[in-house]
Amino acid sequence: MEQLKAAGYSRVALVSLDVIPGMEYNYDMGVYQNYKNDFKKMTLGTSLMYWQGQAEQADDVTETIKAMATQFPKQGKHDAILIMAHGTPQVSNAYYSVIQAKIDELGYKNVYVYTVEGWPSLETVMPKLKANGIKNVTLMPMMMVAGDHANNDMAGSEPDSHKSILEKAGYKVTPYIHGIGENKAIQAIYVERANDAWQALEATSK
């Protein structure tokens, strides 16, 4: 922001690359509040998942799930997909319950969301695998990039990694080491978010 000010920009559209409006999105809002009066016009776009389809708003959650589903492997009755999200100590952690509910509503069978640092945890989800006779598990991050959490917490060789825990429980595990930022359908949604922020900037400039 300081560089933009120094360069003489007067209109700024902030685009968030956050998945849900959690702690990092609060930081984005803080940046917006701190700098909005330093420019003639400034707007802030929403996170990947923000609106949930109520009160005539868009259903970002359903849109995102459908986009992620383009990378789901073909499933048999003994196969499950576990989607690893980050998790947050904030109230926005409730988004993951909404995501799971909409996954179920859309008819995706044996697809479960769990978190690294929130609820539900892997241990919360594992009983569902046993109850449904699952033998094969695909682990998939719901994060922009496949970084430390994906490579180590999810798919690492250490005994406390999610892959190791599941393998010890008798499951065949296949990690999918790609962030959702590589997903073309997700990229298209982020372009929509950027366009929304820009259009809001244009609207406030008239």
Task: List each language-model region with its residue ranges.
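Extended amphipathic ligand-handling, pore-lining, and cofactor/metal-binding catalytic surfaces
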Residues: 1-138, 144-206
